[in-house]
Design a protein with these regions (language model features):
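Soluble ligand-binding/transfer domains with enclosed cavities or grooves
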Residues: 1-5, 9-177
């Protein structure tokens, strides 16, 4: 949604990091994928992450270079999003609650020297709610499933849940690569 446009500081259990969203060619607001992935990656992995690059031939694919010649290839294979604007529960006239939901399924392949690639499926479900002060509260659930070659088990190998707070105005010198 349009209220996502701009630079933000995210506070979560993983730390604090900048993210950016800008209007795309069709006018819809999209995340700056490589920048945002590098920011989150550095918060989670620290110096293990060297860089994140978008694949110029496939907008749904990213490559993350890690130490020890590891390469993490992430490809979004399905996504869906929905925006809602509903009256606030307090019933006050003109009072609205804007929410945005996103669901993304990615296939990740970890390439490691001298070993076969490790494949996993990651599903991330996110809910964001615009606050009256212009900040955004977020909640994310992530489930990691075995590789497709291991069968299509409905039970995740791992799951995680995070609370996020996006505050407007990332410092202009904040950068990631």
């Amino acid at each position: 949604p349009s209220w996502f446009a701009g630079s933000w500081i995210v506070s979560s259990d993983d730390g604090t990091y900048p993210v950016r969203f800008a209007p795309g060619a069709d006018g819809t607001v999209v995340g700056e994928r490589a920048f945002n992935a590098a920011s989150v990656g550095r918060a989670v992995l620290g110096d293990t992450l060297l860089r994140v690059d978008n694949d110029p031939a496939n907008p749904n694919r990213q490559l993350a270079a890690l130490i020890n010649d590891l390469l993490l290839e992430s490809t979004v294979v399905a996504r869906r999003s929905e925006s809602l604007v509903e009256p606030e529960a307090d019933g006050l006239a003109g009072s609205e609650q804007a929410e945005f939901f996103a669901d993304e399924l990615a296939l990740q392949v970890l390439h490691q020297p001298g070993a076969p690639p490790r494949i996993s499926r990651i599903e991330t479900l996110s809910r964001y709610r615009l606050q009256s002060d212009g900040s955004i509260d977020g909640e994310q659930w992530q489930a990691t499933y075995a590789s497709p070659g291991s069968g299509l088990a409905a039970v995740p190998l791992r799951s995680a849940h995070w609370q996020l707070k996006l505050t407007p105005g990332a410092p202009p010198d904040a950068h990631a690569s």
